[in-house]
Amino acid sequence: MRYSNSEKAMAKAEELMPGGVNSPVRAFKSVDTPAIFMDHGEGSRIYDIDGNEYIDYVLSWGPLILGHKNKQVIEKIHEAVDKGTSFGASTLQENKLAELVIERVPSIEKVRMVSSGTEATLDTLRLARGYTGRNKIVKFVGCYHGHSDSLLIKAGSGVATLGLPDSPGVPEGIAKNTITVPYNDLDAIKVAFEEFGDDIAGVIVEPVAGNMGVVPPVEGFLQGLRDITTAYGSLLIFDEVMTGFRVGYNCAQGYFDVTPDLTCLGKVIGGGLPVGAFGGKKEIMDQIAPTGDIYQAGTLSGNPLAMTSGYETLSQLTPETYDYFNKLGDLLEQGLKDVFAKHNVPITVNRAGSMIGYFLNAGPVTNFEQANNSDLEMFSQMYREMAKEGVFLPPSQFEGTFLSTSHTEEDINKTIQAFDTALSRIV
C-alpha cells in the first residue's frame, strides 16, 4: 500500500498542530508507522486519502456501532442541520434521547447531557463529592476516564501508549485525593476503604476496562465494589463511555447485573458526533444546578445534531443486535486463537460483547500489569502487516477493537485470513 498523500498531509499537520494531531494515538507512534489520514467510510469499510481500503475495527474508537454512514442516521442529521446547528436553548431532541437512555438504563432516573466523555466523568466526580461531602475518589490502575486532572493518574489508553505513567501538570493537591488500586483486586479496595473510607466520595470504574486493551471484570468484582461502597456510604460510578450500549442492550451494568449509583456515557449515544452524558438516581441528580447547588453547564450540551444522531443510533439497536455481535465475536475470537496456535505464537483474547482485545502473551490478562506483558514489538509488526492486508486495527496495544452491525461473517473470515498471512511473514 502507498501512503504518500498521508505522509504529505502529516508533514503539513506537524507545522500546524502539536505532533500533527488533535489526539495523541492518531500519530501512530507506538506502531512505528506513518499516520494515516482518512477520507471517508461506508459500512464496515474505511478509505484513506491514498485510496486504500480497510475493514475497520476502530470505528472512531467505538461510537460507530452501526458502521460508517448509516443511511437513517445521516438522513436525520441532514434534517436537523436544515433547522439549524445550535440554539442555546432546549430542543425536543434532548427529551427524546434522554427518555430513551432512561428507558434502556434502569439505574438512570435522570440524565444530564454534555459534550464529551471527559466532561461526563469530571462532572460526575464533582457531583459525587458534593452529594457525599467527601473528597477522595478511588480509580483503578490502567482505567482511563478522560483527561481531567484528578483522573489522569495511572491511566491507561493514550498515556500507556506513550509510556507515561502520569501526566505532568497535575497538581499534587489534586492528585492526593485520587486513590489508585489494581483493577480486579477486591482486597486492595478493602484496604483503601479501611484507611480512607470515611472520606471516599466514590469509586469510578470501567465495568469492562477498555483502555488497557479489553479486560473484563473477574467474577464477583463488580458486585464486590457495589457491596463495599454501599457499606461505607460511598457512590459507585460506572464509566460506561465505552461500554455503554456496546456490551449489551442495557449497557455493561445490565450485562453483569450490577447497579451503580451514577453512570457516565458517551461514544455510542452520539452516533459519531461529540457527546457525553451522566445520570443516576433522582435524589443525586437533583443536586445539580438549577435544582441544586452543584454547578454544571455547557454551551453545546445537548446540541440538536448530536442528540438526533444518538437517538437514531440507539433506536436501531435491539436485543437481537447483541445476539449478532456475539455471533461475530465468537467467530473472530476462535479464529484468532486458531490462527495464532497454527503459527505457535502465544495469544490471549479477551472479549465482552462487541469489544475484543488481543494480547501477545500467554495470559491471563486481568489487570494493567499483565496487559503490559504483551509483546509490544510484535504488536507493532502485526499492525503494519495487517494494514497491508487491508485491515484497520487500533494502532495501540492498549485500545480495544470494535464490531458494528455493518460487519459480516465474510469480513471476519477475511480478517482471520489476513492474520494468517501477516503471521506467515512475521514468524
Swiss-Prot record:
<dbReference type="Pfam" id="PF00202">
    <property type="entry name" value="Aminotran_3"/>
</dbReference>
<comment type="subunit">
    <text>Homodimer.</text>
</comment>
<keyword id="KW-0413">Isomerase</keyword>
<keyword id="KW-0627">Porphyrin biosynthesis</keyword>
<dbReference type="InterPro" id="IPR015421">
    <property type="entry name" value="PyrdxlP-dep_Trfase_major"/>
</dbReference>
<dbReference type="GO" id="GO:0030170">
    <property type="term" value="F:pyridoxal phosphate binding"/>
</dbReference>
<feature type="modified residue" description="N6-(pyridoxal phosphate)lysine">
    <location>
        <position position="267"/>
    </location>
</feature>
<protein>
    <recommendedName>
        <fullName>Glutamate-1-semialdehyde 2,1-aminomutase 2</fullName>
        <ecNumber>5.4.3.8</ecNumber>
    </recommendedName>
</protein>
<keyword id="KW-0963">Cytoplasm</keyword>
<keyword id="KW-0663">Pyridoxal phosphate</keyword>
<dbReference type="InterPro" id="IPR049704">
    <property type="entry name" value="Aminotrans_3_PPA_site"/>
</dbReference>
<comment type="pathway">
    <text>Porphyrin-containing compound metabolism; protoporphyrin-IX biosynthesis; 5-aminolevulinate from L-glutamyl-tRNA(Glu): step 2/2.</text>
</comment>
<comment type="similarity">
    <text>Belongs to the class-III pyridoxal-phosphate-dependent aminotransferase family. HemL subfamily.</text>
</comment>
<dbReference type="InterPro" id="IPR015424">
    <property type="entry name" value="PyrdxlP-dep_Trfase"/>
</dbReference>
<dbReference type="InterPro" id="IPR015422">
    <property type="entry name" value="PyrdxlP-dep_Trfase_small"/>
</dbReference>
<dbReference type="GO" id="GO:0006782">
    <property type="term" value="P:protoporphyrinogen IX biosynthetic process"/>
</dbReference>
<dbReference type="InterPro" id="IPR005814">
    <property type="entry name" value="Aminotrans_3"/>
</dbReference>
<dbReference type="GO" id="GO:0008483">
    <property type="term" value="F:transaminase activity"/>
</dbReference>
<dbReference type="GO" id="GO:0005737">
    <property type="term" value="C:cytoplasm"/>
</dbReference>
<dbReference type="GO" id="GO:0042286">
    <property type="term" value="F:glutamate-1-semialdehyde 2,1-aminomutase activity"/>
</dbReference>
<dbReference type="InterPro" id="IPR004639">
    <property type="entry name" value="4pyrrol_synth_GluAld_NH2Trfase"/>
</dbReference>
